[in-house]
Amino acid sequence: MGTMMRIGLTGGIAAGKSTVAARLKQLGALHIDYDALAHQIVEPGGVALPQIVAEFGPDALLADGTMNRPWIADHVFGANAAPGARERLDAIEHPLIYAEAARLEHEHPEAAIIIHDIPLLAEVIDDIPFAFDHIVTVEAPVCMRLDRMVEERGMSLEQAEARIRHQSSEEERRAIADIVIDSTHPLPEMLAQVGEIYAGWCAGR
């Protein structure tokens, strides 16, 4: 039996990363979803919430004990953001997310292949405390991603364009990846490619 293999999976919003992640999970990989972890730590009782309130003040919390997402969106990411607000929030959340990812790895010693599904991997690659055996990026043209965001996620075109602008570019993601998956291919063809990649990882362990 070989050792565990750790894979970084990334891709721009609406590029098809979730489809690739779902297929890898079906094939037997342990899937660690960083978006899910980011939501988990700011739920009522979550480890990040008290630190966020201490850093940004009581306006960051709603009366029902949940995070005030519209306020955070405006004061950390939006027009009313103070200088360095995004970095202050990241400094709270990122170490907690990494710690939770490490805990999940530790809880599954049987996992042969572990997928760290990280939308912003290119942005955090220098700080993340994990070494990856491979990094996969999933790509699609911006026009296709915009269509998906408007038609499938109910965003306005302006919202969709803003979300893409605030992420790293395809070139930046390609620079850290050794495997590129093009999600413009027909779905069966793309899933077959994912299966071939996974089989290669299993054989290489």
Curated annotation (Swiss-Prot):
Pathway annotation: Cofactor biosynthesis; coenzyme A biosynthesis; CoA from (R)-pantothenate: step 5/5
Determine the domain of life of the protein's source: Bacteria
Please give a single GO biological process term from the UniProt record: coenzyme A biosynthetic process
Q: Which residues bind ATP?
A: A14, A15, G16, K17, S18, T19
Assigned EC number: 2.7.1.24
List, for all copies, the residue spans of the domain called DPCK. 6-205
Question: Pfam families, alphabetically?
Answer: CoaE
The record's InterPro entries line, in alphabetical order, gives: Depp_CoAkinase, P-loop_NTPase
- Would you tell me the Gene Ontology cellular component terms? cytoplasm
What catalytic activity is recorded? Answer: 3'-dephospho-CoA + ATP = ADP + CoA + H(+)
Subcellular localization: Cytoplasm
Disulfide bond: is it a keyword of this entry?
Answer: no
Which EC main class describes this enzyme? Answer: transferase
Q: Which GO terms describe its molecular function?
A: ATP binding; dephospho-CoA kinase activity
Principal cellular location given in the protein's record: cytoplasm
Q: Which UniProt keywords apply?
A: ATP-binding, Coenzyme A biosynthesis, Cytoplasm, Kinase, Nucleotide-binding, Transferase
Function per UniProt: Catalyzes the phosphorylation of the 3'-hydroxyl group of dephosphocoenzyme A to form coenzyme A.
Q: Which family does it belong to?
A: Belongs to the CoaE family.
Q: Which NCBIfam families match?
A: dephospho-CoA kinase (TIGR00152)
Protein name per its UniProtKB record:
Dephospho-CoA kinase
